[in-house]
Amino acid sequence: MKKRILTGITTTGTPHIGNYLGAIKPALELANDFDESFFFLADYHAIIKNSNNNEIAESVKSIALAWLASGLDSKKSFFYRQSDVPEILELSWILNCVTAKGLMNRSHAYKAATALNSSDEDKGITM
């Protein structure tokens, strides 16, 4: 069985040293230990924090360049933009339909997001 790694960065701004040290560099080093590596630009995730399409598009370019400048070899790794793969949204819809709210309540990312916005406690989950 092939060993695979998957990671991505949300495209919400200009890449910085924290992105490089905390995500890009470790992911590229770790990829050497795997048969296949998948790196993606999480532009759908960015919509949660920024509704300006132009800013997100610029961030996608900046972060893609940061990955490539840091040594990502697009001939050896799969490198893609989240919005270019429609099956991601389809799978997300299916998972949303079968995932219990209790599981989300235990998620650190979900708890942090809801703590920041008490006026919309579940971030639009129940609409």
Task: Report each predicted region and the residues it spans.
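NTP-dependent nucleotidyl-transfer catalytic core
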Residues: 1-127
